[in-house]
A protein has these predicted regions:
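Short amphipathic alpha-helices in soluble, non-transmembrane regions
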Residues: 75-87
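Short acidic, Gly/Ser-rich segments with clustered Asp/Glu that frequently serve as metal-coordination loops
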Residues: 13-19
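Short, charge-patterned binding micro-sites
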Residues: 43-69, 104
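Conserved small/polar residues in nucleotide/adenosyl-binding loops
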Residues: 1-9, 183-189
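Short beta-strand-to-loop capping motifs
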Residues: 8, 64-68, 119-121, 136
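Short secondary-structure junctions
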Residues: 37-43, 88-93, 154
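Non-catalytic RNA-recognition surface used by pseudouridine synthases
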Residues: 92-185
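Short catalytic helix/loop segments, enriched in acidic residues and glycine
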Residues: 24-34
Length: 193
């Protein structure tokens, strides 16, 4: 075996972001602990980026190295994924694990990221705690005019991690437009790094 990639989702409510923290629980810590137990050896998982405290993630790519062999623990990555999901808490799930080339890196091979921001204007028990609730009418045209100003290619060095070693701080925000669905609005954005 060699380099493996996984795609995971998480409800970040109970976590202090993706990255391992010295005094707080993180998604990375939980995933590494469960994956290490499953694989039978200490395993470090590298994520495609970071998330802040309480942030949810969907289709978050991460990779790890594994030199073991399929056998008594699991027959293939599909079975390993199924077993790993049985070990993980309900707020973290892994969609898939698959082998990748040694040059593939979750963070440095990532070419694009997408974010969705949620706002809801009516009572919706499925969105409470996952979306900003607004109690007044919203001007969608004005919101989209403001969002259009986010679509540009420019310098984003103010948002980088200090000493993070980024190759570039130029970001190309390609899309930012609010859409309405029943009682909630979403702002899907995409950018290339």
């Amino acid at each position: 075996m060699g380099s493996e990639m996984c795609i995971r989702d998480s409800d970040g409510t109970a976590y202090h972001g993706w990255q391992r923290q010295p005094e707080s629980i993180s998604v990375q810590q939980v995933l590494e602990e469960k994956l290490s137990n499953l694989l039978g050896s200490d395993t470090t998982v590298i994520g495609c980026g970071r998330t802040d405290t309480g942030v949810h993630a969907s289709a978050f790519y991460a990779h790890f190295e594994w030199e073991g062999e399929f056998g008594s623990r699991f027959a293939n990555w599909e079975q390993a994924c199924w077993k790993l999901n049985g070990m993980l808490p309900p707020d973290i799930g892994v969609r898939r694990i698959f082998e990748v080339g040694a040059q593939d890196h979750a963070r440095f091979s990532a070419a694009e990221r997408a974010y969705t921001y949620w706002v809801h204007t009516g009572k919706d028990p499925f969105l409470e705690g996952r979306s900003a609730r607004v109690y007044e009418d919203l001007d969608l045209a004005a919101m989209n005019a403001a969002s259009a100003m986010l679509v540009f290619q420019g310098e984003f060095d103010a948002f980088q991690k200090t000493g993070g070693g980024q190759k570039t701080t130029i970001c190309d925000v390609r899309h930012a437009q609010w859409t309405v669905s029943y009682t909630h609005l979403t702002l899907p954005t995409s950018s290339q790094v």
